[in-house]
Amino acid sequence: MAQPGTSASSSSAVSFETALLLLATLTAFAANSILCRLALAGGHIDALTFTSVRLLSGAVVLTLVLVAKSRQPVIAIDPPAMLALMVYALAFSVSYIGLAAGVGALLLFGAVQVTMLSVGLYRGERLSAQAWFGFALAVAGLVTYLLPGKASAPMGAVAAMLLAGCAWGVYSLRGARGQDPVAATTSNFLAAAPLTVALAVIFGSGWHITTEGMVLAALSGGLTSGLGYVLWYHVVKKIPALTAATVQLSVPILAAFGGVVILGEPLTSRLAFAGVAVLGGIALVVKGRQGTVAAASAKPAQQSGAVVREQWIYGAGI
């Protein structure tokens, strides 16, 4: 993968083909929430089995992609990343037993970004006033949605999705260290899948499996996760860095739209307010961090790569 800081200039135009691929990728990420909600809320499969099938099918598709590119899959296991992937995938599944698709996607997105930004601050990253304001706005949006009330979501499901977001934030930061994200993602899927299956065998006393549930889980793992990741890692090399970070804001919106149209879920004023606050806040953070990095005098290219790469890796998580 090309260095993020040099993959596309901030002024370069995005071709029509790239725009279509980008739209397909973002739709795939949003579809993960729809497929999971369809499978679990509909009672077609239990969460542990769904997670196992999702990771297995993702591992198969990612391996086939590497083989098709005449590359020998090499398993280079990163234990913390593998564990984070497992926690993310399982918590993601559990949460959608009780969360609407749009709500889950928004909580996941917010938790990932807050986790990654918090780690950045701990490591000494400095934010502009605009980025700080955006961070506070995003956190306020999440807190506002989580306040008790008639429209509040089940707290157990909310906690599971926040855990999934924190885990994916950790996975993203681990992935930011590598140079070949497709190979790294394949390795982590190959390592996590059998362990998750083992957990399902050991602890899955409440198995509930239907053909429809298996198909939905396989689509989530192989199509919207596996192929979605490959498309994302391909398309980010062709678009400006700020665009790559910003377009991810559309994923929760697409998921909420899909939930309303496909699943018949309500779009509440509470969710709309939280969505505007969280997505608007993250947009300010992205823009503010970009400006801070561009203005830095010490090793600007490396700093830009570190910030942008984290944003790019996250895109594979929804």
List the predicted regions and their residue ranges:
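Glycine-/small-residue-enriched transmembrane alpha-helix faces in small-molecule transporters
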Residues: 1-52, 87-91, 140, 150-177, ...
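C-terminal-most transmembrane helix of multi-pass membrane proteins
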Residues: 2-5, 55, 147, 249-318
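Hydrophobic alpha-helical transmembrane segments of multi-pass integral membrane proteins
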Residues: 16-24, 48-64, 133-137, 155-163, ...
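Specific transmembrane alpha-helical segments of multi-pass solute transporters/efflux pumps
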Residues: 28, 63-112, 117, 137-144, ...
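Hydrophobic/aromatic residues within transmembrane alpha-helices
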Residues: 39, 50, 54, 95-98, ...
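Specific alpha-helical transmembrane segments that line the substrate/conduction pathway
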Residues: 49-60, 85-86, 93-126, 164, ...
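Hydrophobic transmembrane alpha-helices of multi-pass small-molecule transport proteins
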Residues: 62, 85, 127-147, 164-166, ...
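Helix-helix packing/entry segments at the starts of transmembrane helices
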Residues: 90, 104-111, 175-193, 225-261
